[in-house]
Amino acid sequence: MTAKKYDAVLACGGFGTRLKEITKDTPKPLYPVAGKSTLERCIQQLEYFDFKNLIITIGYKSKKFLKFIDELNQKYKVDIDIFEEENPLGECGALWVIKDKLCNDFVFINGDLIFSINFKKLSFFHMRLSSKLTLVTHTSDHPDDSDLVSVPNGTLVENIFLKSNNKNSEKNAYLGNSGIFMINKEVLDKLTAPKEKDSKSVFHFIVKKIFELKINIYSYNTTEYIKDMGTKTRFLKVEKDLENNLVYKNNYDFKQKALFVDRDNTLIYCDKDEYILNSLNLKFIDKNI
């Protein structure tokens, strides 16, 4: 029998310190937002895009997760397993422990996100570029406390800007890290697992180290809805967006309005229903509009 391989990892081991005023004694991923937990909303998205096996890394208040996971396994088709940290491993430290159980290319998601993205398009982008590490990026509405990337050619990350003590001086000139990644396992083989005292986020450890090794990192930039609820202000904004049905309508699974105009104000028509990665995918419109 073929061993089960996980195609998605959800990191839920954080303490959620900044949101304690709202969540109290409940871990952030389990706290209901507009009537449903962040964790369950994530699993709904993964099921919709045919993910088969999800592993959730937990640490803080782990017993609360264990009870809830049994309910979710009965409710959804995604097969959900748990990796419980004996000692805090940071956001990404568990990846080296569970590496042999991961698919060659897997999705990594921070557990405090409310999102709706088309994972099939993300996977197509990642595979077409033979990417080893793809960051899902977007225009951040809080760049001063986000990790940022410079992507002048549209896909290849040219530079990274790490926030320090939740501050980043780079502001609006660059794309923000969304907290969703697609990772090839070769990346883990090239790095030594972080020591417990050095445990950091995917961006601050994996992205930083791979960038220093001069291995190509790609940016999948999307206008789809991805927001963390790490502060009270953001939590209330996300809750309001959910109540007003603003989260799912920008998913690329649905047709979006778009207008391509070059620098000479020429309208451009995309000949194929996919990302423009080659000029052959374009054609000029002869008639006046």
Short names for language-model regions:
Residues 252-256:
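Short, small/polar residue-rich loop motifs at catalytic or cofactor-binding pockets
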Residues 2, 153-154, 264:
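Residue-level recognition of short loop/turn positions
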Residues 257-289:
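Active-site neighborhood of HAD-like aspartate-dependent phosphohydrolases
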Residues 65-66, 70-153:
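Conserved beta-loop-beta/alpha segment of the NTase-like Rossmann-fold superfamily
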Residues 106-107, 114, 120-127, 140-143, ...:
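Catalytic-core segments of class I nucleotidyltransferases/pyrophosphorylases
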Residues 2-65, 280, 286:
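N-terminal glycine-rich phosphate-binding loop and ensuing alpha1 helix
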